[in-house]
Amino acid sequence: MAQKPLEGAQLAWMTVALAMATFMQVLDSTIANVAIPTIAGNLGSSNSQGTWVITSFGVANAISIPITGWLAKRIGEVRLFLWSTALFALASWLCGISNSLGMLIFFRVIQGLVAGPLIPLSQSLLLNNYPPAKRSMALALWSMTVIVAPIFGPILGGYISDNYHWGWIFFINIPIGLFVILVAMATLKGRETKTEIKPIDTVGLVLLIVGIGSLQVMLDQGKELDWFNSTEIIVLTVVAVVALVFLVVWELTDDHPVVDLSLFKSRNFTIGCLCISLAYMLYFGSIVLLPQLLQEVYGYTATWAGLASAPIGLLPVLLSPIIGKFGNRLDMRRLVTFSFVMYAVCFYWRAYTFEPGMDFGASAWPQFIQGFAIACFFMPLITITLSGLPPERMAAASSLSNFTRTLAGSIGTSITTTLWTQRESQHHSQLAEFVNPYSPQSQEMYRQLEQVGMSKQQASAYIANEITAQGLIISANEIFWLAAGVFLILLALVWVAKPPFSSGGGGGGGGAH
């Protein structure tokens, strides 16, 4: 941008507005998850049908994120941000008043489409309007909202669905959206980016919609339909692969691509995207797995499972401003290295301590300590990713990097939940082999259970439940071990990035120096 960076109260209010927009969008991607049984029951549908409330949003959102850079070039970043926020608030209201599942799914598609530009543009507008010396602080504050929102989403969603009409899951976006619009209009007035009318890449757009849409539906519905034992999943996979291969070829040869894949010619952009995506895949998979484990094995309610996960957000809130202030004095690769080491430590910690009879603290403490890893994760990796890019490419780079991160989160969720289920089945079979009428240990176990008043059938049911719980814990611990190992491998990848690193953006600091 040619404009002078914002300062003082105007800068502070802009930061709050952009952070709230990010928080609102990320929150909405997880808040409905725990409320699906309530929503489905209220609308006269099954839980499996209700999952389309999540899938529809995810598919539409995944399609719209990568075209944000192209839209911003045509419309302008500020104008696109304001329209996206307004339409998101409107779509939220329409979701809340829906009286059928089909109506709700339709408006969730609209909501997902208009939500796509919010995160990339909030990041781009922050960087382009902050003084160069304070851009690390801007990224740190922005990162805080991306991390905290998915943790509080299930807690808030569970509380609302337990105590109020489920529509309030969506209605809460309306006052936030209005606040964001009013503040953004006041602080970003006259700061519109340069627009450029380019031909519409119709072929690329169609390939993107078909490829990403098929891939996202496949990831969301794969477990429900038993993956590749389902014809539907096989067809979706083939369509996604073919469309995405053609998309890459087309976009690399088209004069006006809808997705600027040439960004991957930058070593730092490629390394940054890989590290963010793979790490976020592991992180997001774990925050989906942990509440399910606590509810299914340890009998936690949805609210208490959310509270056990919530400590992960405490340290980032405290440390992000400090890291943002002093982080630019350090080699960003060192901060990321510390983050990945702490991630590995916490995953190993869980693998060692998760066992039957585990108390609340055993699950909450690793979450709390993992906050160190998260605080040193987003800001330095985004800085590496965007370093050396000119201001006019910031929106496209931000949208593409956020798309890879979002897609990685979906992949992480699918892989984690599928592995957990499949490994549990294997461990259940192995453990059940030790329980048979001829085993002295089994006979003793039945005798002890019958002594406390259980019938033979009750004792068998109790033992079967214990075997299932053991299988779920063992399979979860295997996933934790695997995640820790991948984080240690990622340590080497981040050092392929090449300094110097700047926080991106315009005005005197946008490129490599």
Put a short name on every predicted segment:
Residues 182-202, 249-258, 355-356, 426, ...:
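Helix-loop junctions on the cytosolic side of multi-pass membrane transporters
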Residues 9-73, 78-84, 92, 96, ...:
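Transmembrane core module of solute transporters
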Residues 143, 151-152, 286, 363-441:
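Small-residue-rich alpha-helical segments with characteristic i,i+4
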Residues 34, 66-67, 121, 151, ...:
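Residue-level hotspots within transmembrane alpha-helices of multi-pass secondary transporters
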Residues 175-193, 210-221, 239-253, 491-498:
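C-terminal membrane-cytosol helix-exit motif in multi-pass small-molecule transporters
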Residues 9, 49, 179, 405-499, ...:
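Hydrophobic transmembrane architecture of multi-pass small-molecule transporters
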Residues 37, 161-162, 220, 291, ...:
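Juxtamembrane/transmembrane-helix interface segments of polytopic membrane transporters
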Residues 65-204:
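Helix-loop-helix hairpins in multi-pass membrane proteins, especially solute transporters
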